[in-house]
Amino acid sequence: MASLFLTIISLLFAAFSSSVVEAAYSNGYTIPKLLPNPIDSCWRRNPYWASNRRALADCAVGFGKSAVGGKYGSIYVVTNPSDDPENPRPGTLRYAVIQSKPLWITFARDMVIVLRNELIMNSYKTIDGRGAKVEIAYGPCITIQHVSHVIIHGISIHDCKPGKSGRVRSSPTHVGSRKGSDGDAIAIFDSSHIWIDHCFFSRCQDGLIDVLHASTAVTISNNYFTQHDKVMLLGHNDNNVEDKIMRVTIAFNHFGPGLIERMPRVRRGYAHVANNRYEKWQMYAIGGSADPTIFSEGNYFVASDDPSKKQVTKRIDSGYDWKRWKWRTSKDVFKNGAYFVPSGYGTVTPLYGRAERFPVSHGSLVPLLTSSAGPLHCYSGRIC
């Protein structure tokens, strides 16, 4: 029965994937009528997206569903790619993200923003790169610390460098002395209701995305990751018991070539890893320590040709305790000898509220579901 089901799924995928993937990569004129990715199907069919950008805030799924970003604020347009960490100018990205009021931040044109120190975000902000090619690169990158309700969509963050010690403004009324940052693309500390969607990540000094210090209610979706060592860290220390509250959804991402480990690496909290594509990790794909709960559902794993690197999972510094950790696989597809080592007993089903739930497809559909991962080519008046 199981083999018959997989055969049917494969035939359906073969029949539809060609035209659908072509549509997804087009210049915005067409899009499949029944786009199965529930986030994209929420907004991408509307050619007038640029007239109602804030509708995107209704489209998240999973634990970060309630992130509203700047939905209830005004539109702010970045016109100036320069940066001053202490006294940012109006028109710059930093001037927008430090404001106390909600803002939906867009970009007047294509730009590469080289930050002079870490970009510290305030609550209720959306960075929306649709309609422009926006890169944050070659300097320190983004810090989300002690805040809530942040959406980052449609930008490229790459080649991030450590931030130096110095004074950095975090609000209109506060400038603080910072000790420096690690060189992550996005570092999330003690924050909640965060959604990172349709971004590109690569080649940073430290991690690409870190979710730390009891951060929770986070969704990381539709992103493209490539050419990096330590990709995604959920909890930075086994002794941080507060990370037990961490709830993170990782869905519809493409973990592409040149990645080594941590897709993600989890401590103590809960990770729902659903409908992601993994290509030839060089150490492991999903790892953890300190008794995290991990539910791998409907993913597509392609192992490297190295016979020593076929296992998807890795328990780190665990002794024999790992056998009771709840790590499960369901509806996953394993290619080129890839395999997942499950453990533990009891349910691992994510405790989503009604609005947070989303359909998770069989792993055989993941190449289709993730075909538009990364920033989209969006033009006003056309379907993205």
UniProtKB/Swiss-Prot annotation:
It holds the Pfam family Pectate_lyase_4. Residues 1-23 form the signal peptide. It catalyses: Eliminative cleavage of (1->4)-alpha-D-galacturonan to give oligosaccharides with 4-deoxy-alpha-D-galact-4-enuronosyl groups at their non-reducing ends. InterPro entries: AmbAllergen (IPR018082), Pec_lyase (IPR002022), Pectin_lyas_fold (IPR012334), Pectin_lyase_fold/virulence (IPR011050), PEL (IPR045032). Its EC number is 4.2.2.2. Its cofactor is Ca(2+). The active site is at R262. SUPFAM superfamilies: Pectin lyase-like. It is an enzyme of class 4 (lyase). GO terms for molecular function: metal ion binding; pectate lyase activity. Ca(2+) binds at D182, D206, D210. Binds 1 Ca(2+) ion. Required for its activity. Pathway: Glycan metabolism; pectin degradation; 2-dehydro-3-deoxy-D-gluconate from pectin: step 2/5. GO terms for biological process: pectin catabolic process. This is Putative pectate lyase 2. It comes from Arabidopsis thaliana (Mouse-ear cress). The lineage of its organism: Eukaryota, Viridiplantae, Streptophyta, Embryophyta, Tracheophyta.
